[in-house]
C-alpha cells in the first residue's frame, strides 16, 4: 500500500516534549474498544469533559463521526475495517505529537489492528481501554437500533452478530459497564492517569 516515493521526513523545530511541557501533562491515546452499545462513546465523552475541567488538552475521535468525513469512503468489510483503524491510528499519532490526550472510541474488533496502532507509538503513549459488556446487554441497549437491523439481515458484517470481536489480550484498563456507572468508570480512568503521572 506504500505508494509514496521520493519523500523525506521534515523535522520540526517544536518537539513533542516542548508541547507536553507547555500543556503541563503527557500526551497519549486512550483507545476505547468494545462492542457496539458497550458504552464507548458515552464513557469517552464523559471522560473528555472531566479532563477538560482539569485543564487537560484533549481531542475526542468517535467512530461514527470519523466515518462522516475522513473515512466516509470505507465500508465494513475486514479490509475496510483495517484501513479505518489504520487511518485513525495515524491521526491519533499526530495528535499525540501535538501534545494532546486523544480519546478514540471505535469498535476496532481485531487485535492485530489495535496492536499495529500501539506499535506506531512510544511504549507509554497507547492506553487500551476495554469497555466490557456482554453481547446480550449491548443488544438489549441497542441505542441506534443496529442489532435489530443485523438480526433482520438488513446489516451485514455486524460485529458480534456475523462478524467477530476479538477481546483485548492485555488492556491497560478494563471497564465493566454492566456493573460500573459512567461516573465510577470516569474516576477509574482518571485515577489511572494520575497514578501513572499522565496528568
Swiss-Prot record:
One of its GO terms (biological process) is sulfate assimilation. The keyword Flavoprotein does not apply. GO terms for molecular function: adenylylsulfate kinase activity; ATP binding. The keyword RNA-binding does not apply. Keywords: ATP-binding, Kinase, Nucleotide-binding, Phosphoprotein, Transferase. Belongs to the APS kinase family. HAMAP family: Adenylyl_sulf_kinase. This is Adenylyl-sulfate kinase. The gene is cysC.
Amino acid at each position: 500500500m506504500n505508494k509514496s516515493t521520493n519523500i523525506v521526513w521534515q523535522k520540526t523545530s517544536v518537539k513533542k516534549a516542548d508541547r507536553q511541557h507547555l500543556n503541563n501533562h503527557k500526551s497519549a491515546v486512550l483507545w476505547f474498544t468494545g462492542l457496539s452499545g458497550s458504552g464507548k462513546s458515552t464513557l469517552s465523552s464523559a471522560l473528555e469533559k472531566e479532563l477538560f475541567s482539569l485543564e487537560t488538552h484533549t481531542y475526542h475521535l468517535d467512530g461514527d463521526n470519523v466515518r462522516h468525513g475522513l473515512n466516509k469512503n470505507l465500508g465494513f468489510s475486514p479490509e475496510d475495517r483495517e484501513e479505518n483503524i489504520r487511518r485513525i491510528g495515524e491521526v491519533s499519532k499526530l495528535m499525540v505529537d501535538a501534545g494532546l490526550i486523544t480519546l478514540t472510541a471505535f469498535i476496532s474488533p481485531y487485535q492485530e489492528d489495535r496492536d499495529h496502532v500501539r506499535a506506531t507509538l512510544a511504549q507509554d503513549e497507547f492506553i487500551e481501554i476495554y469497555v466490557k459488556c456482554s453481547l446480550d446487554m449491548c443488544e438489549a441497549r441497542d441505542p441506534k437500533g443496529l442489532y435489530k437491523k443485523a438480526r433482520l439481515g438488513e446489516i451485514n458484517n455486524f460485529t458480534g452478530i456475523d462478524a467477530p470481536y476479538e477481546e483485548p489480550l492485555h488492556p491497560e484498563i478494563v471497564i465493566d459497564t454492566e456493573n460500573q456507572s459512567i461516573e465510577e468508570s470516569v474516576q477509574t480512568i482518571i485515577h489511572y492517569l494520575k497514578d501513572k503521572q499522565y496528568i
